[in-house]
């Protein structure tokens, strides 16, 4: 590696950019895959990409990801780089809220017909795209989850409703997976007790009830962890909770730490209706859905977070800095932890070649998914310039494209994004940081880790080619480290638990030079597993608590230069 580095230095910065095709050690949510353009709103001429409800399984040492209405599925060797597989035999409209289960590395099973009536598909060679159907039909299955236990007994779980609970039944694996025994109701939402299950943005809807959906069963150390999504996929608070049992059919007990997968703050929001899988190093990873909800409510992206089970058997998912760069699953010993690169571009001045109507370039650095820059054309004359206002060490960039009247539907061959990103210290002499001029990849959420970090004050995006008739970008994010000081720890943390014990207000003294804060909380001082990112404020009202649960809170501050130590941890009864 040292010899390669010296060779690249000798060749100059354009050669450094070419090195980005080498393996990356980090990733950044949302996942950068070639999302399918949806067809189930095509009758309204609404065009958008989406990926949701990921079912990720390991099969013979590699990984397969099944995603709602994608007309196929993805394959990966490392959970980082994914290739799309167009199956030869599949559900005609694509699988909906699919399930997948690996049975002893011999057969991979999949379910998820959008009609709710379906055969279980199976394959011993999913790379080939060849599947067969069991000669039986199972009915009335919404968001199915197939699980085969170590003893060979098979179960089907399902549920997607604001009325009906998660249900389950045993199947006869040796008799065409026909139902065996009675349907059993396992559990439903309990909104009067569980604040996070309430509907609406920030759980604010007091009229409509939440939805329970997307069951996914994980077995760990003899315990069964039934994960479920709530309260609504279009909201920032979409999350996964978990119940625990000693048997697949229950009885199930609500885990004290809930929700387990929760990301209501920051750039990308939501972390619900997911699946949990063991990665290349044996660590657990949780995949889930994140909300865009611009063109339609069901416009979504996928995310991946490190997960695990602590010494007390508590399941958790780490979403702290969940849309910042993290170590990739295959990097030994890192367990997907936060890389330590900060956001350099937040609210920095932006200029652009052109802008159409109200969609100006300021949207590119506001950390809001629902705003975007729209150029007057989609040609090579379009550019964006971000002034970081002072030099910083740039380590990675992320370009999040947006669909504005794209007029594309289904799987379309040959889509590609081509662009160049340059860096400069003075605004006059430019070096290529990212070179996608010859790319044949479809990269709607392109994240690139620079092979060699560079010092720059100005970052320039130059468009070459996009697959859509309009050039629209939601966010151009620049990651790295400034040369200043990280903020000090927040002081004067105060907690006010409301009369409605599902709600709490967290306050702290503003920290000079802080860009934002992470509110951390959990059921014990050593179990602060939950995190809520807050920009430009020193107060947070949360409506996600369990009424009879005690909690511990802390707050950390961050800026372009790093992260503070957490504040003192405070207890609220």
Give the predicted meaning of each segment.
Residues 169, 419-421, 517-519:
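Short beta-strand elements bearing conserved aromatic residues within extracellular beta-rich modules
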Residues 368-432, 444-489, 497, 509:
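Aromatic, loop-rich ligand-recognition surfaces of beta-strand-rich domains
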Residues 380, 441-447, 533-540:
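Short, solvent-exposed loop/turn segments in extracellular or other extracytoplasmic domains
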Residues 20-207, 219-266, 281, 290-333:
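Beta-rich carbohydrate-recognition and catalytic domains
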Residues 167-179, 334-366:
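Predominantly extracellular/luminal regions of secreted and cell-surface proteins
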Residues 513-532, 536:
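Extracellular low-complexity, O-glycosylation-prone stalks/linkers
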